Amino acid sequence: QNVKQGIAERARSHAAEGLDQRSNPYRELPRAESDARAAAGEPFAVRLKVPREGQTRFEDIVYGTQERNYSEIEDLVLLRSDGHPLYNLSVVLDDIEMAITHVIRGQDHLTNTHKQILIYEALGAAVPQFAHLPLILAPNKGKLSKRKHGEVVSLTTYRDRGFVPAAFRNFLALLGWSPDDDQEILPLRELAEKFSLAGIGRANAVFNFTENDPRHWTDDKALWMNAEYIRTMPPAELVPMVKAELRAAKLWREEYEEDERAWFERAVELIRHRFFTLKDFSSQGRAYFSDDFDFDETAVSKNLSKEPRLQEWLPELATRLEAVDPFDAASVEVAVRQFADELQVKAGLFINASRTMLTGQAVGPSMFEVFELLGRERSVLRLRSGVPWFASTSLSHPVKTG
């Protein structure tokens, strides 16, 4: 209590003299008195005695010249009264011990840098180069934090939601930095070749997302980039990732590794172009790997319900396709278009209806390629499976096939 009273009295005295209230109350305490009081067991802290005149100055690689007057810097505490070092001393000693030449960190540490330079100089150590990076902010321009923003800032979230590691790394690299040629898709090797601190901007990046919105749960640019990687990465890299996703969803068959490997790789190649995450292979792409799949209600409404005559026409189309030989994309296309011409309707009616019946979706790859991939037996069965529920007025329960 006496120590606190003494500090308060000295602070009031300094304030009366026009000194900064942050000034060290013991700054002018004679060394002999300080040593005697410490030897007598009085608690004490160790401070850095900052010069009153002059300034610290350094060239930040990103933010340029940084200056601060000594009068704006308090006599910072280096060691607490319990002997524990504070942050600024700890990081300086750590960097000296590891012979760090470049300190690269967030721009919220710019203020600390002036204090740390004083410690380097007091210890007679070489001052490293500093590069302070712009921050990544939330949509409201506040700092991102796990406490406030939860899963959206957790790497495991992106792993569990089907992000390709290389894609997410690429996305993060472009938050605050860009290459000279504005290229956006940058595999690791190219990132390493093109990256330079000179390419880092000074403006903070904003991580755009909408909380509690399943469509915009993360930044749209991150999803776009993930889709680009899924569409363009070498099959040898993508196929094992899809295998892991299907295995987790209990859709993997060992035949895909053996007799049906060529079919599996072809399926991945055909359907990957509209997917945004690896999860899409087991959700939107489920119909390719299982006969137990859901129908998208929008797809049913758009492609089936508007034309009640499809209840009769689709089984007839199935009968036509049973006779198609060979059962490939070109032959199926001829059969579908001929059938549409005979009924004097547009072929698109059957193309769209077939897509929903065979995959449960409203959009997807070339429908005739889908017919060929799924094969005659599954295609015919699925075209006929809609009859029992075509007249249903409710889709409150997922429609299954098989």
Where are these regions (language model features)?
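Catalytic adenosine-cofactor/nucleotide-binding cores of aminoacyl-tRNA synthetases and other
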Residues: A126-F295, T359-H397
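Active-site cores that bind ATP or allylic diphosphates and position pyrophosphate for catalysis
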Residues: N2-H132, L137-K146, S154, P179
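C-terminal accessory/binding modules appended to enzymatic or scaffolding proteins
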Residues: V239, S305-L358
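Short histidine-centered catalytic/ligand-binding loop motif
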Residues: H102-G106, T157, N303, R320
